[in-house]
Amino acid sequence: MWYFSWLLGLPLAAAFAVLNAMWYELMDDRARKRLAADPTAELALEGNKHH
């Protein structure tokens, strides 16, 4: 019966990885568009970085 957890878990993990990558690409595209529209936006974003 252990194989049921693998049968359900692997596709779920793969779907989560794909959705995570799609979200990252969406956020990256938004940031690039914002930066292209306003080049000074990068300076404002640098102040929000936590080291």
Swiss-Prot record:
Pfam families on file: YbgT_YccB
Periplasmic face residues: 27-51
Superkingdom to which the source organism belongs: Bacteria
Record bears the keyword Membrane: yes
Catalytic activity: 2 a ubiquinol + O2(in) + 4 H(+)(in) = 2 a ubiquinone + 2 H2O(in) + 4 H(+)(out)
Job description of the protein: Required for correct functioning of cytochrome bd oxidase.
Protein's name in the database: Cytochrome bd ubiquinol oxidase subunit X
Biological source species: Brucella abortus (strain 2308)
